[in-house]
């Protein structure tokens, strides 16, 4: 509780003490934490299943060596020309910015009121930091929402326009023919998945993957609703069995525990299911880029402006069937 020497601020005192200068000072003091706040927000869910690539200046190309070599019976005369090629995939980051006007008194009273309920009396600098953290975390929330379905649109104004998300990249590669049945990295479901066929459908999809992919630990990235269908179907089939004591199934039945479900909230409505590894889905950023910044200004009376800039981009590192498999869903309509 607040002590006599730590009296709670009145609204007028709050207005006088929490100024644009205080917020700007807080933004400078906690610049790195604010710039990384969107990433920290992503760690709550999506970054558990994808890989963050920091320090990307404009772009970085990942080369994949594809070739074949094998042993044969010993021969002094053995000599073969190498059959190989290097395939490069480029992770590009794009600068984005946010200019957000807010009523300082509404925000201050909301955050300050929360502290009063808890019996706290935060310092002015602590309040300023919390205010900025709320906005920075919101930026991370939108990044998380659109990391799969974003479509690069230079004329856009939202996070969904900043870069091509993973699903957008995948859909473009399907159209280009780089993901196909012929290449062995595409499976097409023959019927819509529901609560009566989800187990068989997902098992069939997994079985269709390349043997090398099935031999390593992978994630199955899917719409949470499809995962719930799988759980319901599995429970309906096996609920009475003695060993079936755990409703939540973390790995796909029949994968020998190698394929772990990744039912991400931001995959809701996705038209595909993906089997791959964490290091195949790359999110690029650069917190040290001079364009990355968080600031607060007062451009007009009674209105503060939160300014944030950062660079982000996504890429699928390899489309190789040995590391990547896509299942194209069939619509129920």
What is the meaning of each model-derived region?
Residues 113-204, 332:
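Alpha-helical scaffold segments that mediate packing/assembly in large oligomeric complexes
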Residues 32-112:
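Assembly/oligomerization interface modules of large self-assembling protein complexes
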Residues 97, 132, 215-217:
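Extracellular structured ligand-interaction cores
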Residues 110, 144, 229-231:
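Short helix/loop capping segments that flank catalytic or ligand/cofactor-binding pockets
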Residues 100-102, 222, 308:
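Hydrophobic side chains in beta-strands
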Residues 2-52, 59, 63, 163-192, ...:
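Sequence/fold signature of self-assembling virion shell proteins
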Residues 205-212, 216:
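Short, basic/hydrophobic alpha-helical segments
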């Amino acid at each position: 509780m607040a002590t006599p020497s730590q009296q709670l601020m009145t609204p007028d005192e709050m207005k006088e003490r929490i100024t644009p200068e205080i917020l700007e000072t807080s933004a400078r003091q906690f610049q790195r934490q604010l710039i990384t706040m969107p990433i920290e927000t992503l760690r709550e869910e999506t970054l558990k299943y994808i890989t963050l690539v920091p320090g990307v200046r404009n772009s970085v190309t990942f080369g994949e060596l594809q070739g074949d070599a094998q042993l044969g019976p010993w021969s002094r005369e053995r000599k073969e020309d190498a059959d190989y090629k290097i395939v490069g995939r480029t992770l590009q980051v794009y600068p984005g910015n946010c200019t957000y006007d807010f009523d300082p008194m509404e925000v201050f009273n909301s955050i300050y009121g929360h502290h009063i309920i808890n019996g706290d009396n935060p310092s002015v600098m602590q309040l300023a930091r919390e205010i900025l953290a709320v906005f920075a975390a919101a930026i991370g929330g939108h990044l998380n929402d659109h990391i799969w379905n974003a479509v690069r649109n230079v004329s856009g104004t939202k996070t969904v326009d900043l870069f091509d998300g993973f699903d957008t990249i995948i859909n473009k590669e399907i159209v280009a023919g780089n993901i196909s049945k012929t290449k062995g990295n595409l499976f097409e479901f023959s019927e819509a998945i529901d609560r009566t066929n989800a187990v068989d459908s997902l098992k069939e999809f997994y079985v269709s993957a390349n043997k090398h992919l099935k031999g390593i630990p992978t994630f199955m990235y899917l719409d949470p609703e499809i995962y719930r269908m799988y759980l319901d179907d599995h429970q309906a089939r096996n609920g009475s069995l003695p060993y079936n004591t755990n409703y939540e199934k973390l790995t796909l039945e029949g994968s020998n525990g190698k394929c772990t479900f990744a039912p991400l909230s931001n995959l809701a409505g996705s038209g595909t299911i993906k089997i791959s590894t964490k290091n195949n889905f790359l999110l690029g950023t650069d917190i040290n880029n001079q364009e990355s910044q968080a600031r607060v200004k007062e451009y007009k009376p009674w209105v503060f402006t939160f300014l944030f800039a950062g660079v982000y981009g996504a890429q699928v590192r390899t489309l190789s069937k040995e590391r990547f498999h896509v299942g194209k869903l069939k619509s129920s309509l």
